[in-house]
């Protein structure tokens, strides 16, 4: 019996006006895969894609083809024929269906990519604009339009004086933007990877086994460019397709990993067929953290199964190249030790055998920057070795890899890849103009260093608004005043008591981000007994940071993915790239160091089009000068979402929050909020640290604990002093008894 229907039977309210709590819970990310992973869709674009997928033509067919179609329809629609004729027509229809199926299978295997109908430029523009995909040619205008400018001018007008050439008007900014815009063929479905782009049959089967059917926006735009190449003179069939260098800015959880793995694997499979004897590392994928690198390897192993391609995670002590100077050193050491005894020779040879590991036999190497640099330079003791076979370098989370922390290491790896046809692709959800300029200058330097006459296009693909959060999650910015207020608000999330509609309801599993490792440890110790023993107790909450060993980190990640851990307290170690598809929300216990970090943190929920994710950010009095950039991102995200009703960020709040100077932004990005920095320099900083301490213990209890620790330390010091002054330990000799 429905109580709502009973109480509202005299009204005109619809039965579905008040959704039940069970219905609202079904919209959580943890409930399962979204029906459509795309973030931006429109009916017009769907119509164009449907027509392209079924091979329909928009114009009416005329002539003999139309007459044949009419004859076929007349033959099929014979309603008044005899029963024998109907049976014969039915058997003929079955035979025709079988023949058509066999022909279709044969066509899928043997047909060329040119036989597949391509969209015209208007259709491509419609689809790309509807999905908010913008592709731009980043090269100089002289490289983009040299042929076009010459072809438009007649031969007589080519002979000009210098004065006339100087007087020619330059393109306006609007015309330059228009000249740089590119409209490549979009990917209609994953089936096209086999029919149009001729990827490996086994790779196509592996993609289908993973359940990928509808491409996301980033896959819709990048896969045709990386598999089919970029045609410099438009979509004409006569134009030569060239694989471009690519900069991709796409929202978190939009499928960037699959977008760069499929072309890399397919390229290596083709190379294996063309040159069977040549083996080595053909692609290098660089990621900023071990967690992200291991995740890429796990996804890659699902795709390379049965293809003959090997993908490997870089580990400490692995040998990547065979250095000639290593052999020279070994031979030199052998010559110098010829005069040594046989007993000394045996352990030295065994030591050499143990110390020299075999070279890694892999096609794709996934690594963090420092590990590969140390392997190529023998822990910075020798010049960098080269990777001559590498044809693709992929920088995942490129804005971090080309930032100050990893920049030198990443550029060293890039320079070590010496193949003249090396293609680079940079991927991230946030990418500043300085990163784009650095990538552009690095590619230009390589071109000059290797005297490359052939110009490769450099394209930038942006999905949605650049450097913005995904629109399918709900953002909450909560003022907690003090550290104790944040702790109280977090406990209210864990144990919701109020029934107000405006209150935030966040169900596990979720992530909690802090600024530093000590704060993450302190918050974990404070919350570990908040979950009742009936629900699993302290085993349901864990802390993850870079001070833990690799084994501990992988074990925590495994338990969190399995669902044994519900709440994970962590630092920005997990803020980038790591894919937790079932996370219901993210809590920023400490505000992020920059707007880009906020975008990546909240992007751990709402992945692959899942709706219902919540991002809660607590801020205190000390955080007020740094909050405006986060508030702006939330405001833009809500506008992009088209959210109706009351917004979480009001205009008066945006006007009241102070702007941050460039110097302060740089300081915040490097060190975080000053009040929460772990290093203490003065008494004033000590007082600030006390105010931002994560603890609910009283001052009396803390003093008693400190006294106890001091007594234990004093006892240890006394014991060590007595042992050092023990007469039995003196070195003085005994002269015997005097007579």
Curated annotation (Swiss-Prot):
Against CDD domains, the record matches this protein to: DEADc_DDX52, SF2_C_DEAD
Which keywords has UniProt assigned to this entry?
ATP-binding, Helicase, Hydrolase, Nucleotide-binding, Nucleus, Ribosome biogenesis, RNA-binding, rRNA processing
Q: Which portions of the chain have biased composition (kind: Acidic residues)?
A: 67-76, 323-346, 728-739
Q: Where is this motif: DEAD box?
A: 396-399
Q: Where does ATP bind?
A: 250-257
Q: Where is this region: Disordered?
A: 12-116, 145-179, 320-358, 665-739
- Work out whether the entry's keyword set contains Hydrolase: yes
Q: Which GO terms describe its cellular component?
A: nucleolus
InterPro entries from the xrefs? Answer: DDX52/Rok1_DEADc (IPR044764), DEAD/DEAH_box_helicase_dom (IPR011545), DEAD_box_RNA_helicase (IPR050079), Helicase_ATP-bd (IPR014001), Helicase_C-like (IPR001650), P-loop_NTPase (IPR027417)
Looking at the record, the residues that make up the Helicase C-terminal domain are 489-657
Q motif, short sequence motif: residues: 192-220
EC code(s) of this entry? 3.6.4.13
Q: What does the comment on domains in this protein's record state? A: The Q motif is unique to and characteristic of the DEAD box family of RNA helicases and controls ATP binding and hydrolysis.
Q: How does it assemble?
A: Interacts with the U3 snoRNA and is associated with the 90S and 40S pre-ribosomes.
Name-wise, this protein is ATP-dependent RNA helicase rok1
Please report the organism this UniProt entry assigns to the protein. Answer: Aspergillus fumigatus (strain ATCC MYA-4609 / CBS 101355 / FGSC A1100 / Af293)
Q: Which gene encodes it?
A: rok1
